[in-house]
């Protein structure tokens, strides 16, 4: 018996299969000391694991360490640029905390790292930027550091070129000579529409869940797809089946021609897609 499939397009977003451009920015300024000094630190293995999980062999990737440019060195510093899925642990193990002079650790400039990545290795083309940081915003920071941190938050929240931002808070107790830390933050920034689609695909396919066991916090956008509709049935017909397509963008009604009704009364649940975190420093 012939059936009719009626589809209602909920969104024009489609899954992509072409190569993705991805950058991995690793903070190595002073506040990161315990992540580099603690012999039990899983910081570098984590980064390597993320790269191996989210990067496809044909992806274009760039791996950089960043702090803030100073008289001794420019930031960010690229340690690898090329095809994806390359084992990076040996390259990461060679990285250490940066200094701004003979006695003091380097400061941090997130905006410099992001903008430099977009304009140089990305050549202003769409891509996903991963940031590995302790997210330290200490009350003891000087006014310039506080201003730079605020500038970064403004960049990721207000700049329309950054389409999507996810945050993955992770526990990782580490101790260094001068500083201790209880955990870190991994950000995923989608620069441009193509990167937003690629990042969505990484989440929806379950690929990201292979390395991050908890659902990410959505920082941006806060006004797009906040809820998901989950069809439960058709109220006025027991023979019509309602479902969503695999990408959750198309509403599908499965019915026989002789049982077509002039009006479909859909019953559905609404799922809140925001995942709240209460993060204690």
Question: Which residues are covered by each model-predicted region?
Answer:
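Extracytoplasmic/secreted cell-surface and envelope-processing proteins
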Residues: 32-39, 71-76, 114, 137-146, ...
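Extended non-globular C-terminal regions
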Residues: 239-281
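Residues that scaffold, gate, or flank divalent-cation-dependent active/transport sites
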Residues: 27
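Gram-negative bacterial Sec-dependent N-terminal signal peptides
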Residues: 1-19
